[in-house]
């Protein structure tokens, strides 16, 4: 009985179907034991299957985790060599790699996935068939149990021939167990071999990727790649670069102008110091015979006036800078509240205060004009210094020659005149008269003033020359007429100095007149603009009173719809200067205010800054460009209605 029960248990635990012809005959007392044995075998089989399934899932989880780790390492290796990884993976044409390790790995990976899919499909079908067989087996066992407990006539009769045939076809349970174990061992070997192949292929792929990266670092890849950025991104980057370049150019130009102004101011101070030093040197080392007191006094007076004017202008400029800094500091202190400042670079808003840029424009123009005049003045002063040095050297040489040789030549001519007679004397006299008439009329007055001083000097020279040559008393009469010959040359040089001084004075006067005219024109423009603005405000107020706008305002305030107490106005600004659009809007509930440019909504940011303080709303542009010119609109919306106000911004180019 034990052998029969063991064989029945083995048959029941096996997965092969049991032929119906073989029914072992057991006693009625062993049916319960048989059922319990079947139940235990079924539970053990289920437990063994669940353990195998858990083990298989655990191994699969470990394999997948290892594969994901290796794949992440490969991705990290690839990402470390690339400069930038595109955030969005776009579909692109990737050529098929054949004849390389990558291509072989891809083919083997596809083949492995196909085999895995086939194995899973076969395993699923096998499990379904096994479940069906187990259900049929359970039904047969229940039927046998019912037959044994109930009617014996329902038992299946055993045919010897069929039983022999079935016994011949039936395999031994030990053979079945051996085959089952061999199949499981072969499956494990196949699984380990497959894992080793995958590991080898992964290592080969990593090596190939590293080698490919090294070769790509040395030479460009021959396979086409995808674009790293689209055309829109390139265009956006180009526009941003252009805008940054324009900002840097404006900043650089401003810095250069500031440095040039500082350099010019330092040079002007240095030149003033040098001019003072040169004046002291000239006063100390000037020759006694070239002392032109009138010209020197006049030049000193003009230089003193010029220095005073420059010091006054510099002092006024410093006062304006201090006043501007104090005003700006007070504005920052007044408007320093977290409601207004949405950014650190945002300027303060003072309600009721109108910013006018023509003060800054006037200051810039005055600085440009001052720099230009100072540069011209320095150049002319240098030229005059050079001419003065050259003339002084020439005059010194001529004076020395005249002092040493002039009188000797005169006395020789006088001796010749005594010998030649009165005709040559008359010709020489007419010659000197013509030379005297060649002097200009404007210089005659100053010549007469200097004649007394020169005459005394000439008399002393004549006396010394008379003593040297030991001439007769007749010589003391005629050299008096000849003594004016060197004086004519001095008169011409003096006239030349006078002409130069007069030309400089006229040029300075003309420049002062031009500056006055420009200042008057600019002030007149400011006055006209202020009067025009006041006239427009008066007309708007009168029109609002005449048209009954006060009642409309009262109706609008009662209705709660937004309306503009102070609408936008057309304005113009110089290129790269800041601009602010200010409106006053009221409404109940509080309206939401947005700003628009050429039909496009402007977002609050660094380029376009929204400022809000009570009913006053502002749009502030820290810096303007030529493309910022156009139509701007302020739109206010609440639940009761909406309102809008528009204006035109004009960008003027800075030509100076």
UniProtKB/Swiss-Prot annotation:
Region (Disordered): 1-131, 165-198, 215-284, 468-492, 529-564
Entry-linked PROSITE patterns: IG_LIKE (PS50835)
Keywords: Actin-binding, Cell junction, Cytoplasm, Cytoskeleton, Immunoglobulin domain, Phosphoprotein
Subcellular location: Cytoplasm, Cytoskeleton; Cell junction, Adherens junction; Cytoplasm, Myofibril, Sarcomere, Z line
Keyword Cytoplasm: yes
Main location: cytoplasm
One MF term in the entry's GO annotations: cell-cell adhesion mediator activity
Matching Pfam families: I-set
UniProt function note: Involved in regulating cell migration through association with the actin cytoskeleton. Has an essential role in the maintenance of Z line and sarcomere integrity.
Name of the protein described by the UniProt record: Nexilin
UniProt organism field: Rattus norvegicus (Rat)
């Amino acid at each position: 009985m034990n052998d029969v029960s063991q064989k029945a248990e083995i048959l029941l635990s096996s997965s092969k179907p049991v032929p119906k012809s073989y029914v072992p005959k057991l006693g009625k007392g062993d049916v319960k034991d048989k059922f319990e044995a079947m139940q235990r075998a079924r539970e053990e089989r289920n437990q063994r299957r669940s353990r195998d399934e858990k083990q298989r899932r655990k191994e699969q989880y470990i394999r997948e985790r290892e594969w994901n780790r290796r794949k992440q390492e490969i991705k990290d290796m690839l990402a470390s060599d690339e400069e930038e990884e595109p955030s969005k993976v776009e579909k692109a044409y990737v050529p098929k790699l054949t004849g390389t390790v990558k291509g072989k790995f891809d083919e083997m990976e596809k083949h492995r996935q196909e085999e895995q899919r086939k194995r899973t499909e076969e395993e699923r079908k096998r499990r379904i068939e096994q479940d069906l067989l187990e259900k049929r087996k359970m039904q047969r066992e229940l039927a046998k149990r019912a037959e044994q407990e109930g009617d014996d006539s329902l038992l299946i009769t055993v045919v010897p021939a069929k039983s022999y045939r079935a016994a011949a076809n039936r395999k031994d349970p030990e053979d079945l167990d051996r085959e089952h174990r061999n199949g499981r061992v072969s499956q494990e070997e196949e699984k380990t071999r497959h894992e080793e192949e995958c590991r080898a292929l992964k290592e080969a792929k990593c090596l190939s990727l590293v080698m490919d990266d090294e070769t790509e670092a040395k030479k460009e890849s021959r396979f086409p790649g995808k674009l790293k950025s689209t055309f829109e991104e390139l265009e956006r980057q180009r526009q941003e670069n252009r805008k940054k370049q324009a900002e840097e150019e404006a900043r650089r130009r401003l810095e250069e102008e500031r440095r040039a102004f500082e350099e010019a101011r330092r040079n002007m101070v240095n030149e003033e110091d040098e001019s003072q030093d040169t004046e002291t040197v000239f006063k100390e080392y000037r020759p006694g015979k070239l002392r032109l007191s009138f010209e020197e006094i006049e030049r000193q007076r003009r230089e003193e006036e010029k220095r005073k004017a420059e010091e006054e202008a510099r002092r006024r400029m410093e006062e304006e800078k201090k006043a501007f800094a104090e005003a700006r500091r007070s504005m920052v202190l007044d408007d320093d509240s977290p409601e207004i400042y949405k950014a650190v670079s945002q300027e303060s808003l003072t309600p009721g205060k109108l910013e006018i840029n023509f003060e800054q424009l006037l200051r810039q123009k005055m600085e440009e004009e001052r720099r230009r005049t100072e540069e011209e003045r320095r150049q002319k002063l240098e030229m005059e210094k050079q001419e003065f040095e050259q003339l002084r050297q020439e005059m010194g040489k001529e004076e020395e020659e005249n002092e040493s040789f002039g009188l000797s030549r005169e006395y020789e001519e006088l001796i010749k005149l005594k010998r030649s007679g009165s005709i040559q004397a008359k010709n020489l006299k007419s010659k000197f008269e013509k030379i005297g008439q060649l002097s200009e009329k404007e210089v005659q007055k100053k010549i007469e003033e200097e004649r007394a001083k020169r005459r005394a000097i000439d008399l002393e020279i004549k006396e010394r020359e008379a003593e040297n040559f030991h001439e007769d008393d007749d010589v003391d009469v005629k050299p008096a007429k000849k003594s004016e010959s060197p004086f004519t040359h001095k008169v011409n040089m003096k006239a030349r100095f006078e002409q130069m001084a007069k030309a400089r004075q006229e040029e300075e006067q003309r420049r002062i007149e031009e500056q006055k005219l420009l200042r008057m024109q600019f002030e007149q423009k400011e006055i006209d603009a202020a009067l025009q603005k006041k006239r427009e405000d008066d007309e708007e107020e009168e029109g609002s009173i005449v048209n009954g706008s006060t009642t409309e305002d009262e109706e609008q305030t009662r209705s709660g719809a937004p309306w503009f107490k102070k609408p936008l106005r057309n304005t113009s600004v110089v290129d790269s200067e800041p601009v602010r659009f200010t409106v006053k809007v009221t409404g109940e509930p509080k309206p939401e205010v947005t700003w628009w440019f050429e039909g496009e909504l402007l977002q609050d940011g660094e380029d376009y800054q929204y400022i809000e303080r009570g009913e006053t709303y502002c749009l502030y542009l820290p810096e303007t460009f030529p493309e910022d010119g156009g139509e701007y609109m302020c739109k206010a919306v609440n639940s009761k209605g909406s309102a809008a106000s528009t204006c035109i911004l004009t960008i003027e180019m800075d030509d100076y």
